[in-house]
From Swiss-Prot:
Similarity remark: Belongs to the NAD(P)H dehydrogenase (quinone) family. KefF subfamily.
Transferase as UniProt keyword: no
Protein name listed in UniProt: Glutathione-regulated potassium-efflux system ancillary protein KefF
UniProt source species: Salmonella newport (strain SL254)
Gene name of the encoded protein: kefF
PANTHER family: GLUTATHIONE-REGULATED POTASSIUM-EFFLUX SYSTEM ANCILLARY PROTEIN KEFF, GLUTATHIONE-REGULATED POTASSIUM-EFFLUX SYSTEM ANCILLARY PROTEIN KEFG
Length: 176
């Protein structure tokens, strides 16, 4: 099962993430958990989140990039849900062997994220990749949708279909 942990503080304003979720939602065995919908008060149900994670084979952290990082509720989710003794540390093997995909949208162009004046995705992904590896997850190459503020609908739809294809390809390789 693919579990998408979706974290967008303003989901009604996101054309890109909306299209990505629409495409992903057409696949079988996909569960989407919208953190800002489930926890508008930031009071996370840790047991429910850990149960959802335990059912998943692929975990996707999908969100808009905010200040070169994750939105605040996703960071809190990581702090609360990925606990010692469950996700890492002594006895913390609940996530071992599962895959993790970082699916991120950005307002800037892809060239904005090249080493030079701004850090590249290989640098930006390091904290998430380190978290994944620390929890025994298998890190997959990120999926990034760029220029989301200026893309026309056809471009957004095409990129959302690429996202769906990425998830479908994972399903085919990992579950025949």
């Amino acid at each position: 099962m693919i579990l998408i942990i979706y974290a967008h503080p303003y989901p009604h304003h996101s054309h890109a993430n909306k299209r990505m979720l629409e495409q992903a939602g057409t696949l079988e065995n996909v569960e989407i958990r919208s953190l800002y919908h489930l926890y508008p008060d930031f009071n996370i149900d840790v047991a429910a989140e850990q149960e959802a994670l335990s059912r998943a084979s692929l975990i996707v952290w999908q969100h808009p990039m905010q200040w070169y990082s994750v939105p605040p509720l996703l960071k809190l989710w990581m702090d609360k849900v990925l606990t010692h003794g469950w996700a890492y540390g002594h006895g913390g093997t609940a996530l071992h062997g599962k895959h993790l995909l970082w699916a991120v949208t950005t307002g800037g162009g892809e060239n904005h994220f090249t080493i030079g004046s701004h850090p590249g995705f290989d640098v930006l992904s390091q904290p998430l990749q380190a978290t994944a590896l620390y929890c025994g997850l298998k890190w997959l190459p990120p999926f990034a949708m760029h220029c989301t503020f200026i893309c026309d609908d056809d471009t957004l739809q095409a990129q959302a279909r690429q996202y769906k294809q990425r998830l479908l390809a994972w399903q085919e390789v990992n579950h025949g």
